[in-house]
UniProtKB/Swiss-Prot annotation:
Tissue expression remark: Expressed by the venom duct.
Name used for this protein in its record: Conotoxin Mr3.3
Alphabetical keyword list: Disulfide bond, Hydroxylation, Secreted, Signal, Toxin
GO molecular function: ion channel inhibitor activity; toxin activity
Signal peptide: 1-19
Length: 68
């Protein structure tokens, strides 16, 4: 059991948990900043303002919400 503890200690020293990126750093988790960056679907070139959605072709390229 002490070998496992030594191995765990060595692994934590070589690869600390602070080196792992947090999920909060992802832009998808920050919708307010996404809207400020002007990357919302309403500004997508394939957004249909009449139907207020994107065509099925544009959905493959990141335009949401998709028309079904």
């Amino acid at each position: 059991m002490s070998r496992l503890g030594v191995l765990l200690t060595i692994c934590l020293l070589l690869f600390p948990l602070t080196a792992v990126p947090l999920d909060g750093d992802q832009p998808a988790d920050r919708p307010a900043e996404r809207l400020q960056d002007d990357i919302s679907s309403e500004h997508h070139p394939h957004f249909d303002s009449g139907r207020e959605c994107c065509g099925s072709f544009a959905c493959r390229f990141g335009c949401v919400p998709c028309c079904v």
